[in-house]
Amino acid sequence: MGEPLVAWAGDCMVRGVVELGDGRLSDQVNELDVVTFYAATLRALDDGHEVAVDELDVDRGELHLIEVQGRRGDPVRRRRTVQERVTVELGPFVVTGNLHRPPSTQPLAALSSWARFVPMTDAIVGQRGREDRVSRDVVLVNRERISKAVPQSAVPVDSNQPPPAQPA
């Protein structure tokens, strides 16, 4: 059975149904070379023009962001982490959110992991040069597309605590 998925490439948003296995979405996507969308709609980022297709194969590397809805993965595999509030730029996108890493690793360690897509929680997603932003609980960012990463706090936050308030 398929599930809805929204992903963002450099020039469009892709919305459709994908066939994925059980487990965390990030694990599933990181194992694929091509993501196949069924009943897909592509919306151009520049003018909003939409095109619908029955089936669309997208090379995983072309995707910049993937929205995560509902999938939290196996609770048994979770481990204690600290959060780092960071702003990343990838393609036309600017994302501010929390990266998670084990307490004993270096800052921004999540961006040097083996996984192509890494999760960012409490994310605010926008495009460079545009004012509109969207908030998402979790997005997966393609770390190979990141051109800049800027920490927003010098001190990481224990993930068991709520994130610090953002300055106005």
Question: Where do the language-model regions lie?
Answer:
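Conserved RNA-binding domains used in RNP assembly and mRNA/RNA metabolism
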Residues: 1-168
